[in-house]
Amino acid sequence: SAASDVYKRQLLDRMAELKMNVFHWHLTDDQGWRIEIKKYPKLTEVGAFRDSSEINHFHSNVFDGKPHGGFYTQDDIKEVVDYAAKRHIMIVPEIEMPGHASAAIASYPWLGTTGKQIKVPCNFGVHYNAYNVADPRVIQFQEDVLEEVIALFPSPVIHIGGDELRYNAWKESPMVRNYMKQNKITSPGGLQVFFTNNISNFLASKNRHMMGWNEITGAQVNDYQRDGSGASQQQLAPGTIVHFWKGEPELIKETIEKGYDIVNSYHIYTYLDYDYESIPLQKSYEFNPIPEGLTEAQQSKVFGIGCQMWGEFIPTVESMNKKIYPRLAAYAEV
């Protein structure tokens, strides 16, 4: 919308004033697909719209009853990328995979593990739907989508999400279980790393680096992923940028020791949608993204900090601004 465009430009202007140089743009999720992909028009015809939105808080099961939707055309995206570039800001796009896939599966049911038609969810939080990574058509879909994304964003880094994958969809799929057996993969966490590495290889063939939330390492940082199947035996592809958001800070050190670069977005310090009681201004300002106990060479593997504004329960631009400012200025100083 015009209002959304104005707001994005205002945010990019503020970032430029604060000399912040990367804008991470989360473009797909369970509750909506927000970027036009010309090869798959239903992603925005179907996936960009939901019937209602959960309000108040997670798991409230209270809904506003108002249809919600919208997306950015490729021309819209080009304009924003250009506007940011003129202010020395690189935009890193995020296309979620293999979880947070409900909007895509609602658009094309064959992308999921059951093939059943679902609706774009109206409630927020983590959903059970995941891409059927055992189906070559689904891998082709991911590559087709990324091909169009790469053409729009000059960023050398492409973010593939990878967070909060519930393993149930894979465990309950005979096709996925057979695929794991064929590839000698012993756990769903290992399958996620295997899938992620295939996407990394594709991006590398296009001269792009992959970035993803820290579950892409196979770390089971969410309670619902600790299913007794054990840690992943698969090794994440070298050159991947790991976006740390959850888990014990020791995971950062372990990840760096394995040779990966890090962006630190530890949620208890950096989530802008958290209220000021959880993250007061002083806490924002004092956050050190480099954990203790690293050598000088290891410290250089921490690229910086990311601060996230998740919009589930942010109904207006005014309420968003109250949460972003002045904390954004504090993060710019970190």
Segments predicted by a language model, with ranges:
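Short, small-residue-biased leader/transition segments that mark boundaries at the very start
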Residues: 2-7
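Active-site-proximal loop/turn and secondary-structure-junction residues that shape catalytic pockets
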Residues: 27-31, 39, 95-101, 164-166, ...
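Active-site neighborhood of glycoside hydrolase catalytic domains
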Residues: 104, 109, 119-239, 245-248, ...
